[in-house]
Amino acid sequence: MVMCTLCKREEAVFMRRYSGEKLCGKCFSKSIENKVRGTISKYEMLQPKDKIMVAVSGGKDSVTLLHILTKIEKAYPGTALSAVTVDEGIKGYRDEALKVAKKNCQKLGVKHVVTSFKEMYGYKLDEIVNMIREKEL
């Protein structure tokens, strides 16, 4: 069993090829959070009282970012974090992801705005594709 090179207590589940680090789940998660914190700090991306909106598709990457930003937001008094999900209007494509996004926002107490291509452009993406196909025929 290969042990985590950081905590030396847990079994490693991930290896960083560029550094040779072998990380357990907790240390891996903490290292990602620290990278996000470092980037935000280095580029002065957040100031107290900023309004932050994160795009949340419902996939693992955006949901992870939402969780990390929820933790980081606490270090910036007066900031307001909210999330937006865009429903493109592709039949059967976004349904489950919308549920995941909504569930995570509710769990974290983050305001969640859902918008759609239909609201923004007057058409669902499926309708736009059909119109383009009809013109090409």
Show the residue positions of the predicted features.
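Nucleotide/phosphate-binding catalytic cleft detector across ATP-hydrolyzing
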Residues: 1
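ATP-dependent adenylation/nucleotidyltransferase module used to activate substrates
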Residues: 4-137
